[in-house]
Amino acid sequence: MAIRTLLLSWLVRLMSSTWRVRWTDQGPLEEALKTGPVIFACLHGDLLLVAGTHRAWSPTVMVSLSQDGSLLAGVLGHLGYGVLRGGSSKGGAAVLRGAVRQVEEGRSLLITVDGPRGPAGEPKAGALSLSRLSGAPVFWVRGRAERCWRAGSWDSFVVPWFFSRVHMQCGRLAGTADEDGEERRQRLARVLA
C-alpha cells in the first residue's frame, strides 16, 4: 500500500501541476485566512480538484475509516496535507472533537460534505456542526474541469486530464453558525450544485 500511495500522490502532484487553474471570488477567502482557520466544504466528487488546488493553504482533510479512506489518507499525507480519520458513520464524535481541536490550534479543515457514502450533492450536517462548535466560518469550494474523466461511482469522481483548464470557485456560506441548521444545510447544497 505504501508504494501505491506514493505513486498515486506523485501522479496527482504531476497532473495538478499541469492544470491551468482560474479562481473566481477568492478574495474573501484570502481575507478570512488572515484572521484564522476556515472550514472548506466540497462535494466528494470534487475532492481531487480541491486537493490539487489547495496545497498552499494546507488544510487538514477529514477522511473516512474505510479501506478507500486509508488509500486516500496515504495519498493526502504524501501531498503534505494533515489527515483526520473518521466520519458520519464511524468515529463521528471522536473526529468532531479532533476537528474542533485542529481549528483551535489554527488549522483549517477540508470536509467532503456529502461523503463518504452519499447521496451525491446532499450535504450532511458535519461541517455546519463543526462551524457552530469552533466558530470557524464555512467556505464552500467547487470546481469544474474542461477536460476530465468521471468515475462511474456514486459521486461521479472527477479526474481532470493533464493540461486541462480548471475553474475553481469559492465563497463564504451565508448566515451565522447559530441559525437553523437545516436551512443552512440546504443553502450549502444549493451553492455546491
Show which residues each predicted segment covers.
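Short, structured coil/loop segments at alpha-helix boundaries
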Residues: 1, 26-27, 35, 66, ...
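Conserved beta-strand termini and adjacent loop/short-helix elements that scaffold enzyme active sites
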Residues: 24-26, 64, 86-89, 171-173
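Catalytic core of membrane glycerolipid acyltransferases/transacylases, capturing the structured
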Residues: 35-90, 134, 149-151
